[in-house]
Amino acid sequence: MALFVLCAALAGCAYPTQFKPGTPQQEVLSKLGPANTVKKLDGGGERWLYTTQPMGREAYQLQFGADGQLQTTTQVLTAGNFGAIPLGQFTQQQLLQDFGPPMEITRVWSFTGQVWTYRFWDNGIKRFAHVHVDPQGVVQKLMFIDEPLPEPRQRD
């Protein structure tokens, strides 16, 4: 996140958290560009998602009302949000809409389907959320692990 703040300060880059409620959609679009995903909401609003995956650990949902004004900005890659996924009910499409594309999609021998891996911060600790999606596109399992620390470098 510090890199994004530095970028914004030095180069005029935009970041999702800089926009205050009431900011028009067009202003957000002109500064951030197209969102990774856009979801139409009941009542005419939209929820835009901007992610820093695969290398970053943040994804922000910007919710706009039917009037096109920003209502809220929420960082969604959290242990609480992942933990709230209803297993056996949440679909791959919902996963994309709510969390954005993952860091990577892999397979493991112990599960028939795909494992979607997201990087995120959990109380200052770098973590992975492994979301297991079955062949029908339904989330069946969720695992959290700490991101491995780099090996210490050997001195010659």
Spans of features found by a protein language model:
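Bacterial signal peptide processing site
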Residues: 14-17
